[in-house]
Amino acid sequence: MSLNNPTCTDGCTAKAPVFSFDDCNPDVNRGQIDRIYIMALGGADLADWSQLAVWAVRLAQDPTVTVDAIQYMNVIGEKPEAASDVKEISRIRKIVLDKTHTINFDVDETDGTNYDALRQIECGGNFKIWYQAGKYLYGGNDGITAFIQENDMIPRERKELNVFKGVATWESQFHPEREDNPML
């Protein structure tokens, strides 16, 4: 595993993080997760997730033949604030043991292939995922080991869309790695 998480210092010697703000040309990003990439849990890590050629090979592979194949779901999704497991310890100090990260998403293309995929996820929802939002891709070379649940939601109203409602969750002290999306 090649996670690229920050190195946390021991003791009270930690320095303040470095920030960057531009009063004249702020770098802001819009919301919405619009695609989730999914691979079998046993699939091999990507060699370099920032390279389009690496993604092209994995996306072209047949998932019925290799666990290294990556598929994607077009979604309307969000990643709300992670839920932190904060514990108070001696001398009125606090630590974060872990965070529970969640992606809530809807799949609005509910054809037979996507319905079969929903049913396959119900066999056991542990996968490696990456997600894209705006100009960024999240997940690193390893992907995010996440548990996915998906449900078919048929509305009462005739003019409403039938959607698959999904939730992906994982535990991590850190938010996932982020990179400019090479597929845009």
What are these regions (language model features)?
Residues S2-T102, I144-K159:
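Solvent-exposed edge beta-strands and adjacent loop segments
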Residues F19-F21, F105, F127, F147, ...:
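Phenylalanine-focused residue identity feature
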Residues C24, L41, D108-G112, Q132-G134, ...:
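Generic structural motif
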Residues S90-G112, K159-H175:
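Oligomerization/assembly interface segments of phage tail-like spikes and tubes
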Residues G112-Y115, D152-M153:
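Short alpha-helical segments and helix-capping/turn motifs at coil-helix boundaries
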Residues Y115-G139:
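Short, acidic/charged, Gly/Pro-enriched secondary-structure junctions
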Residues Y138-L184:
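Mixed-charge, glycine-accented linear interaction segment located at domain edges/termini
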